[in-house]
């Protein structure tokens, strides 16, 4: 996932990675490792950080010392995290409605967003009963939701042997069209 995101970002600076529903914050840390700009930072946010997240982070730092001081962990709800237009908001396997909340938070500030959704809730969606892949339809709707908010969206996948929930949504605000003088 991180290599797909880094390729999508291309040569644009990462700036700050904000990993929502981060768990151990490994996605954010790998994105920093893939970024040539050592000034990039990361904020790993989860309402319940794993008890041993500091031990895991210390092990990562021991192997990759250039990450020291660049990753901050925050225990918070998604709606309490300050985001900015220059951020890259990422999330891997944000369950159900959390995927929608991640997209909503990123779009509210015009930040770039990369999301690997999971746990697609279909209980209250009778329109999806006859669909072969209801999760694909939900993710199409998420992509269209971003497009309606002025985003360019790419729907990609990561290898299925990495995760069966492997659809990756990548969105960035469309560049403003220059107006004639």
Question: Could you describe each region identified by the protein language model?
Answer:
Residues 2-181:
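Class I S-adenosyl-L-methionine
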């Amino acid at each position: 996932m991180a290599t797909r995101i880094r390729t999508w970002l291309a040569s644009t600076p990462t700036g700050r990675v904000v990993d929502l529903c981060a768990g151990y914050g490994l996605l954010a840390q790998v994105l920093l490792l893939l970024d040539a700009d050592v000034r990039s930072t990361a904020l790993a946010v989860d309402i319940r950080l794993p008890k041993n997240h500091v031990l895991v982070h210390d092990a990562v730092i021991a192997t990759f010392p250039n990450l020291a001081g660049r990753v901050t962990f925050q225990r918070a709800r998604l709606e309490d995290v300050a985001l900015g237009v220059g951020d890259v908001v990422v999330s891997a396997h944000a369950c159900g409605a959390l995927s929608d909340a991640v997209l909503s938070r990123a779009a509210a500030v015009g930040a770039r967003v990369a999301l690997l959704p999971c746990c697609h809730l279909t209980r209250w969606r009778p329109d999806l009963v006859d669909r072969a892949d209801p999760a694909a339809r939900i993710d199409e709707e998420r992509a269209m939701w971003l497009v309606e908010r002025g985003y360019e969206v790419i729907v990609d996948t990561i290898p299925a042997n990495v995760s069966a929930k492997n659809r990756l949504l990548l969105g960035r605000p469309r560049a403003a069209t220059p107006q004639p003088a």
